């Protein structure tokens, strides 16, 4: 039991779970918008998720602490460095448009992590900007990058899909903001408008997400049911999010599992 707990802890802290969620989002995008198998892009999304989240979580800590690091952290750092080298090679060989998307994502990640002028604060301190920037990064990597990679023509359906992806990720971030309300920066949404209003905001955004179905064209009816189920599951977890969680299993594992559940549903039940 102790070994299992340590393994789960490493799985979460090394960002494997959130990277898997990002990859699942990318898989959903490719499966929905293209009839060809372009899944070669998925490993890049997975590695990018690991590197980006470990960068955000651990680089500020490393810069502030000169003490020796734990064996677990050393493994995470070394793995992230190795994957960074691979991603650098991928970046140099990527087409120009893909480089532009990746560059924008990198800039947003840096602005989110480090102070930016003239505010001398990171994006975390600006109200709501943290949530918007993370949702935008997810949308860029999990949807817009696959769209460019597969050369999908832009139309109303694609624009609606992009908007939906942004809205869904935005709401998925809110449980993290709620649980981090005491330790988070001044830009935290629940800290500004309250936990109850944050949950109401999330519900309203999910309503907008559902309304956008009117502009969508899915490969089959299973996609509608999958989307509606994910909306319902997201709403339930949002409203059940406690202001304080001892182990943070709710946000770290359950909420990040929603894209994975979504991807598995599509993998097994869609044509």
Language model segments and positions:
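Intramembrane alpha-helical segments
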Residues: 72-149, 238
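C-terminal ends of transmembrane helices
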Residues: 5, 53-65, 111-124, 130, ...
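Hydrophobic core segments of alpha-helical transmembrane domains in multi-pass membrane proteins
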Residues: 41-50, 99-109, 161-166, 225-234
